[in-house]
Amino acid sequence: MAAASAVPVLNAAVDPVPGDVRIGVASYSFREFSRSLCIKGTKALNTPYLCIKEFHALYRSTPQELDKAKADFQKAGLTLTGGGTVYMLKDDMADIKTYFEYAKRLGMPMMNIGATAKSLPMIEKTLKDYDIQIAVHNHGPEDKHFPAPSDALKLMKDMDPRMGVCIDVGHTTRTGKNVLEEIQAAGPRLLDMHIKDLSDLMNRDSQVDVGDGQMPVVAIFKQLKKMNYKGIVHLEYEINADNPLPGMQKSFAYMRGVNAALRA
């Protein structure tokens, strides 16, 4: 990755100021690159928090290969905050367990998942054997199961508290829902967040660097602080796939600026 190799890699990530919203990377942003370059790019962004997509640790890996992946992240000083989106769409307990075993082997505390109304109870049951949080990731109008976070939340009201949502703010706004209201409604079931910015909040193809679009990032961070949100806001940078780092650096700089402004 040319951009990553051109940026000095710091030896230690920036320690967040207490009270700041913690920001990290969704490795889908580095989907065109190897695990080693994903690690290098994440370190260049000066954050320890990484939520990995399968590109960087394959589901079909052997236990030894997953151990190697885990060691690679640990040696780099990165914290695996979760993985996904992991699709658990089958009404099949054995299939669901394969993903929990994958997450357990990598030491993931959480999985962001795609699910169905039928598979959710099976996932909840399996969770109790693994103590891994489950965050349903919404995917907007094209998602026939859970377009908005509230679509998943209404099925979770009596479920284990380790069942929650990963709110993708871009997909949420495209449903026409108020993203701030969706965040507030999630409350303690908000386990994770994927952030992006759009120049047109209804158009998935209008993604821009965070801070350059219409996403109410400042208001989102204010709401997260008000809720005492303990999770991570992961940048999911879906544009400029062949050279994502410059735009990711700009996005991180903007979000760090928002954090700084909200400390007063």
Task: State where each predicted segment sits.
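Conserved beta-strand positions
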Residues: 25-27, 52, 113, 136, ...
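Active-site acidic/histidine proton-transfer and metal-coordination neighborhood
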Residues: 15-17, 37-39, 49, 56, ...
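Extracytoplasmic "Venus flytrap"
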Residues: 25-34, 53-59
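Vicinal oxygen chelate
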Residues: 55-56, 60, 204-208
